[in-house]
């Protein structure tokens, strides 16, 4: 049976309390995820970091 390679993670904004939920491949992305996404509270693009 195949093992689960994907993990559900949350991305937290560095400038507000906004959060996104996304899926990450554990085998290919071993480090913490960091993406630039749109923050609806601030109405601009900011960096979102992986939080546990």
UniProtKB/Swiss-Prot annotation:
PROSITE patterns: RIBOSOMAL_L33 (PS00582). The gene is rpmG. PANTHER family: 54S RIBOSOMAL PROTEIN L39, MITOCHONDRIAL, LARGE RIBOSOMAL SUBUNIT PROTEIN BL33M. GO terms for biological process: translation. InterPro entries: Ribosomal_bL33, Ribosomal_bL33_CS, Ribosomal_bL33_sf, Ribosomal_zn-bd. One of its GO terms (cellular component) is cytosolic large ribosomal subunit. The keyword Ribosomal protein applies. This is Large ribosomal subunit protein bL33. The keyword Transport does not apply. Pfam families: Ribosomal_L33 (PF00471). Gene3D superfamilies: Ribosomal protein L33. Keywords: Ribonucleoprotein, Ribosomal protein. Belongs to the bacterial ribosomal protein bL33 family. GO terms for molecular function: structural constituent of ribosome. It comes from Chlamydia muridarum (strain MoPn / Nigg).
């Amino acid at each position: 049976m195949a093992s689960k390679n994907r993990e559900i993670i949350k991305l937290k904004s560095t400038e507000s309390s906004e959060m996104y939920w996304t899926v990450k491949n554990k085998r290919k992305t071993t480090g913490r995820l960091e993406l630039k996404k749109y923050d609806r509270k601030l109405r601009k693009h900011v960096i979102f970091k992986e939080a546990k």
